[in-house]
Each structure stands twice: as structure tokens, then as C-alpha cells.
Amino acid sequence: EMAQTYGIVYQSCPPYEVLYTKWLSYGDIIRLKRVEEMVELYYNSNQFTHLIPVLQSRFENPFAMYDKLADFYHEKGYFVHTPARAYRYQVLLEFAQQEDPDGMELYRELAVYDLYLRENAKCRPAFALDEKPYHDQIVEFYQEEEKNRTYLPGYEEYHAKQLQRMTHLEVFSWPVQKKAWELISMLKRGEVPETKTAILFDYQNRDRLTDNARTAVVELPTAADAKPTAGQATVADAEAVTATGKGAAD
């Protein structure tokens, strides 16, 4: 009834989408729709809950980031309605590389963290670092867990190889489990982590609210215990078990 009063022009067929108004041009409407798509993909999906807040801090405000991300998708001709989660991660990291190349190591690791919180990916993402330097230590960790059951309650009937298949252990250069504001402060100070952080993802004990895997910061066997090959790094910054359940279900 008020369409004429407000100068609203809309499609004549359902769902009667607004094309423009007295205050918003057609171009403005299209721009807002593209921003809405980015918000749906990267915020409302709750699949990027650690990467997005840190990347967003590099922009004046959230709208500025989603607006620029929408332009990036449009200019590159990327698909918005793709079912592949890895595709969305890859595009977001490409966008981050363009906007803030100095933070890429952290952004990549936050993407890996977000991905493994959601699923025990059988195919390792292309943006994840090579885990071969820690192979022996990871194997040794699961062998010790089979004996002592320190981090995985409820897995008593499974042996080491089964534990390794059913869960995931990732070694990060950054303490990705920390709050976004802590990581943002580290970035702003130009701080480089001196130690690695090993995080265990437990998919049988998920957070009831978010459906994310339960996580624990764990201690990997030392080089002497695991007998790694020359040049392998160790994880020295072990902390107590934590049960973070950040993010939300698909």
C-alpha cells in the first residue's frame, strides 16, 4: 500500500523483491544483497568463528570487510552458492592475502583450526602446513595415549592406530586456541610465537551447543622420547587440557 509513498519499485512476481526506492538506488540494493550473501557464508554459517574475527579487525568495521569481500567475489567471478567448504576457505584466504599479507601465517592456521573443529577431514586442506616434521612425535603420542589414557576418556577399547584415525592432532605455530583479541594484539605488536602448540581434536565428545569437536592442548613427546629424524621440531609449550567448543553447527 505504501509502495508509491516511499517510491518503492519491486518485482511483479513473488517474492516481490525490491529493486529500488527513493533512498536506495538499484546499485545500492545489489550491493547490500552481495554483502548479505557474504554474511551468510562467513558469519551466519558459524564455520569460520576463529578466522573471521581476527581478519575483521584489520578493517574499519565489519561492514567494510564484508563489502570488500563481496566485491572480491564479484570481481574474481567466484561462486557464492558452492557446497564445498574448502572452496570458501580457499577464497577467504586469497582475500586475506590481498588485504593483509603480513598476517597470512596466522590466517592459514586459524582456517585449519576452524576446519578441524567441524570435521575430521580425510583429505588434508591445501592451505595446511606439512605435518611430516611431526609424524614420529604424533605416532608416539597416540602410543602413549593407548597406555595412559590422559586426554581421551571413553576411548579405552581402541588401540593407538584407531585413536589416530578417530581423532586429529595438529601442530600449530600460533596459539590458535586463544581469544581473538589476544591474537589480534600479537599481530599488532608484530609478535612471533616462540613455541609450537599441539591441539588434539576429539570428535566423539563434541560441544552440545556448537557441535564442534572437544579440543585439548597436549604435550607431544620430546625429541628424545619420540626419536624424530634430524631437523624435526618439538612442542615445548604444553598446557593443561582445555575443552573449547567454539563455533556453531552447520
What are these regions (language model features)?
Residues 1-65:
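A structural motif corresponding to the C-terminal lobe/cap of the Radical SAM core domain
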Residues 37-250:
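Radical SAM enzyme core and accessory elements
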